Amino acid sequence: MKLLLFTALVLVVISLIEVEAENERACIPLEKECTKTPGNCCSGLKCDCYRRFEQGVAKGVQCWCIEKDVTYKGV
């Protein structure tokens, strides 16, 4: 009986530690790169990706945290 209670207590403590660690994960602020972690922008922001070209040659994709309801157009 004591072993069962001890095991349950350990599981509860581990679960609480995991939840706390997830809540403390830092979000990515406005206009910072989110290419590797697209779901980690701060609240009110979205991760928007663009394909980058240099002299007509694709050089990869880059993503940035931007405001959700804002649309950017090329100049």
Curated annotation (Swiss-Prot):
GO terms for molecular function: toxin activity. Residues 1-21 form the signal peptide. Its main location: secreted. One of its GO terms (cellular component) is extracellular region. Disulfide bonds: none annotated. Belongs to the neurotoxin 19 (CSTX) family. 06 (U6-Lctx) subfamily. This is U6-lycotoxin-Ls1g. It comes from Lycosa singoriensis. The lineage of its organism: Eukaryota, Metazoa, Ecdysozoa, Arthropoda, Chelicerata.
